[in-house]
A protein has these predicted regions:
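Conserved AAA+ ATPase "SRH/arginine-finger" region at the nucleotide-binding site
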Residues: 1, 68, 80-82, 99-111, ...
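Conserved nucleotide-binding/hydrolysis micro-motifs of P-loop NTPases
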Residues: 34-37, 76, 81-86, 105-111, ...
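AAA+/P-loop NTPase substrate/partner-engagement loops
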Residues: 1-14, 22-25, 106, 110, ...
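Alpha-helical lid/collar subdomain of P-loop NTPases
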Residues: 72-77, 96-99, 106-320, 345
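Flexible beta-alpha connector loops of hexameric P-loop NTPases
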Residues: 1, 36-45, 101, 300-301, ...
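Conserved catalytic/switch belt of AAA+ P-loop NTPases
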Residues: 6-16, 26, 30-71, 75-77, ...
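Short regulatory helix/loop adjacent to the ATP-binding pocket of P-loop NTPases
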Residues: 66, 82-97
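Walker A/P-loop nucleotide-binding motif
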Residues: 318-337
């Protein structure tokens, strides 16, 4: 019913019993994730069946009066992924109406060309130093290594169903690097740490157990050496909490922070925040400002683990089209972190309250 209502809302009544687009125009209905609807007990997929009815009979039955509505000058363009992983099979009776075009995965050369062009454009626009600009190809190649390794090793399971990676994740690493003010970087180590941070935000933050996290850190260590010619433990030495610390592991890698709010009185620049204690103090200042104007002040004790999540949310909020899904048990501070991060980024949080009168308006 919802599918039918959506399509009918975009059509005009041409004459009695006939609907279509405005005179002289064609209506193209784009249907994304065509094979997403689940099958019912007997194998039917209602959204698919109503679409097929139009293809078979050039219309469907009106829901109230039960009269047949003929639809003219409308065509479908649909997209879908291969069946599996929650995607179902499309019946041959419906599929026969389409010209099927298979869009294969990009090869490595195409991916290198796409993302290298993006990074090159940003670097030239920001007048990045030559020694940093020369690392862009290494960054793209290293990101491709991480992406391909994640596809092969971080496979989805019933307990890790969210271990799904696609080309958008590759792009998020590149876009994250483009957000940074690379024009103020003077050392290659700064650029490599930026790359490590963006890889961790895209891939590491999705991991749910320490075995997978250690696997990714070891992969980072290897790629930093082979692609950038740098020593991972050496360039991240400042993350150690003691002088005789071991190799960089999970506790140290978590201290690699980037953000644009460490210095509130200056222009916001996305850069490394090397002093976690100073970041905690700054966040406490933002918390005081939030409580001074909020009707529901938050009594929070900020500590490093919480700051890590706040910086991650801030990064998502400053990313174009950024959306965050915070997964955790109740009472773990997801809402508090989000409210404080939104305040830091000068956003207002609006919470939808479900009630009996809740509707589209």
């Amino acid at each position: 019913m919802q599918t039918q209502d959506i399509i009918e809302s975009k059509l005009d009544k041409c004459r009695k019993g006939i609907y279509g687009p405005p005179i002289g125009k064609k209506c193209i209905a784009f249907i994304d994730d065509l094979n997403m609807p689940n099958t019912e007990t007997y194998g039917a997929q209602p959204p698919i069946e109503i679409l097929r009815q139009y293809m078979d009979h050039s219309g469907w039955f009106e829901l109230k009066e039960k009269t047949f509505l003929k639809i003219e000058d409308m065509m479908y363009v649909a997209a879908m992924g291969p069946p599996g992983g929650g995607r179902t099979f499309i019946t041959p009776r419906f599929l026969r109406w389409f010209n099927v075009i298979s869009v294969t995965e990009f090869d490595n050369e195409a991916m290198m060309g796409i993302f290298s062009s993006i990074m090159k454009h940003v670097f030239e626009k920001n007048q990045v130093p030559t020694n940093i600009k020369g690392q862009q190809a290494n960054a793209i190649q290293a990101t491709m290594d991480i992406y391909e390794s994640a596809l092969q090793s971080l496979l989805p399971t019933p307990s890790k169903s969210h271990y799904l990676f696609n080309l958008r994740d590759f792009g998020r690493v590149v876009m994250g690097m483009c957000m940074a003010n690379t024009f103020i970087m003077t050392e290659q180590a700064q650029f490599v740490r930026l790359w490590c941070h963006e890889v961790m935000r895209v891939f590491y933050d999705r991991l749910t157990d320490d075995r997978d996290r250690l696997w990714l850190i070891e992969l980072l260590r290897e790629r930093v050496k082979t692609r950038f010619g740098q020593d991972f433990d050496k360039i991240c030495k400042h993350l150690q909490t003691d002088e005789n610390g071991d190799a960089i592991g999970i506790p140290q890698a978590r201290r690699l922070l980037f953000g644009d709010f460490e210095f509130p009185d200056s222009k916001r620049t996305y850069e490394e925040m090397k002093n976690p204690d100073n970041v905690i103090q700054v966040c406490n200042t933002y918390l005081e400002e939030y409580n001074s104007v909020s009707k529901k002040p938050m009594e929070l004790v900020l500590f490093l683990f919480m700051i890590e999540h706040i910086t991650r949310i801030c990064r998502v909020l400053r990313s174009p089209g950024g959306n965050a899904l915070l997964v955790g048990v109740g009472g773990s501070g997801r809402q508090s972190c989000t409210r404080l991060a939104a305040s830091i980024m000068d956003y207002t949080v609006v919470e939808i309250e479900i009630s009996k009168t809740y509707g589209k308006t």
